[in-house]
Amino acid sequence: MKGKLIVFEGGEGSGKTTQLQRSRQWLESSGWLARLQQTLPTLAKPLLVTREPGGTALGIKLRQLLLNSDPEDVIQSRTELLLFAADRAQHVATRLQPHLEAGGLILCDRFTDSTVAYQGYGRGLSLALIDQLNQIATDGLTSDLTLWLDLDVEMGLERSRQRLQQSGGGLDRIERGEIAFHQRVQQGFRALSQAAPERIVTIDASQPEAMVADKIQRILEEKLWQWYPQVSML
């Protein structure tokens, strides 16, 4: 049986990475992973937690170029798109597909919808071109479930600033984009969620972190019982 790909999407400061980690912790503490492991004896670890960009050794280098390059070395929009596509092609071929073929479960921080939202709606590149590149990079792979953490753009950017003040870090190249860019990205995610409601579930990320986590866990539990009915026999 092929595994399942769950993707966490959202704009800057939406909390998607935090919620992905909370979901991982819930899968472990609830016993889901232990039960799933019993049904997949040949798979060393039933859960793969990864991200884009940066889910492979090559991807880590590409992530550095994409997010932390010299501000004076302006990356053109098409260059940015192709770098993200290269990261994804390597990621899918070397990590995602092998794990899915073995029946495993994947939690991924960003995937193809981010490219549509950021490079398509945000940068204004051709959506048809992006679709072609995504098809090439993924070899047709799509998420089984995408959780879009929907949050007001200004609220999200303020969250990012507060987080960075606490950590002593700085905004990355994408976060430094003008607010109009981030608003277009948000419009892109909204359009995607409306076009594919059977795949993309919208989560109100303005709620307290614990409430958001609880809603996501309920969604995941329902999906997991559907996807892995053999676990209920244990």
Swiss-Prot record:
Catalytic reaction annotation: dTMP + ATP = dTDP + ADP
GO biological process: dTDP biosynthetic process; dTTP biosynthetic process; dUDP biosynthetic process
Gene3D superfamilies xrefs: P-loop containing nucleotide triphosphate hydrolases
Organism domain of life: Bacteria
Tagged with keyword Amino-acid biosynthesis: no
Statement: the UniProt record of this protein carries the keyword Transcription regulation: no
The EC number(s) this enzyme carries: 2.7.4.9
GO CC list: cytosol
Database matches in InterPro entries: P-loop_NTPase (IPR027417), Thymidylate_kin-like_dom (IPR039430), Thymidylate_kin_CS (IPR018095), Thymidylate_kinase (IPR018094)
Cross-referenced SUPFAM superfamilies: P-loop containing nucleoside triphosphate hydrolases
Record keywords: ATP-binding, Kinase, Nucleotide biosynthesis, Nucleotide-binding, Transferase
UniProt GO MF annotations: ATP binding; dTMP kinase activity
Pfam families, A to Z: Thymidylate_kin
Record: residues binding ATP: G10, G11, E12, G13, S14, G15, K16, T17
HAMAP family: Thymidylate_kinase
Family (UniProt): Belongs to the thymidylate kinase family.
Function: Phosphorylation of dTMP to form dTDP in both de novo and salvage pathways of dTTP synthesis.
Protein name stated in the entry: Thymidylate kinase
Source organism of the structure: Cyanothece sp. (strain PCC 7425 / ATCC 29141)
